[in-house]
């Protein structure tokens, strides 16, 4: 197969025909065409179309073009000997879930701790709060399986150009996310699919020998000689000392008791810059019309988004996100 870039594809266009036109070959010579990346070109509101990269198989003449190198997952180093003590991961948001999955694949049998509930029970806890204003301090919008973004639309953009990010997308698809995140220029899972993908990641961790404990809160860290010896856990009314020599803290930004504990135990903490802002809401049809003009209602496009940013002379700035 060959890789073909910068293919112009009409919103209702046929991918094979578009590839043939780009390559200047008969349509019948295009045996197969698969999307690798697709973005919307809306610079001209009277000519909104897709720009596509595709993997193409030709009947003849592939040697004239750049070959397609398919993505291959990174090699997993499986431990030859299991560690004497199982690694502990604190927090079942994105960082914790993927840390636990990576350790599980390596044969380390990690223990993943989450102070909140599993995502289905958490949805019920959040809905109860909306209806009654009865707050469950351990299972809510901030705490629980999936992290603080579990009920968002699951945008997957990152400014980090790390090849391992591709593995994350493939893992999410395996966990139940839609296949199109593999080729969308701005991939997102969708609010309706994200909780199921989170459950799927948990099941993958369990299938590889990991353990997941919900409603289990890390309350203390025992150190000796500058090394970790155990973690103390609270589950319901029970307290447990779990012997451990490795701990990954993926607690997010709201577990303030944990940060206070770390400071008390002498851990080095560093301030992180944060942004303050306001929530802006627009009718979706207004944004889609502004971005896509007369094509706004086309079913191939879906909801439009936008991003605005300004950098001020004093070094500060204003920007939009998740729009």
Language model segments and positions:
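Residues forming the flavin
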Residues: 3-50, 55-323
């Amino acid at each position: 197969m060959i890789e073909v870039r910068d293919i112009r594809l009409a919103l209702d266009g046929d991918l094979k025909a578009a590839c043939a036109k780009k390559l200047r070959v008969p349509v019948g010579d295009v045996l197969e065409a698969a999307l690798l990346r697709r973005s919307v070109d809306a610079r001209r509101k009277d000519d909104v179309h897709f720009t596509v990269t595709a993997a193409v198989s030709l009947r003849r003449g592939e040697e004239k073009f750049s070959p397609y190198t398919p993505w291959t997952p990174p090699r997993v180093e499986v431990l030859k000997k299991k560690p004497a003590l199982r690694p502990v991961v604190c927090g079942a948001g994105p960082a914790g879930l993927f840390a636990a999955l990576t350790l599980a694949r390596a044969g380390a049998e990690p223990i993943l701790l989450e102070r909140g509930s599993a995502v289905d029970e958490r949805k019920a806890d959040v809905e109860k709060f909306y209806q009654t204003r009865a707050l469950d301090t351990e299972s809510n919008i901030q705490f629980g399986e999936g992290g603080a973004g579990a009920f968002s639309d699951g945008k997957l953009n990152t400014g980090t150009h790390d090849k391992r990010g591709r593995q994350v997308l493939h893992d999410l698809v395996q966990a139940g996310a839609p296949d199109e995140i593999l080729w969308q220029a701005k991939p997102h899972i969708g609010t309706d699919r994200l909780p199921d993908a989170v459950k799927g990641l948990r099941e993958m961790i369990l299938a590889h020998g990991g353990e997941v404990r919900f409603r289990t809160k890390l309350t203390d860290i025992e150190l000796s000689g500058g090394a970790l010896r155990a973690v103390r856990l609270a589950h319901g009314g029970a307290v447990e000392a779990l012997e451990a020599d490795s701990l990954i803290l993926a607690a997010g930004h709201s577990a303030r008791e944990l940060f206070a504990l770390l400071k008390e135990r002498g851990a080095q903490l560093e301030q992180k810059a944060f942004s303050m802002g306001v929530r802006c809401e627009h009718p979706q049809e207004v944004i889609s019309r502004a971005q896509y003009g007369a094509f706004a209602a086309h079913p191939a496009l879906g909801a439009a988004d936008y991003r605005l940013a300004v950098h001020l002379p004093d070094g500060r700035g204003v920007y939009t996100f998740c729009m």
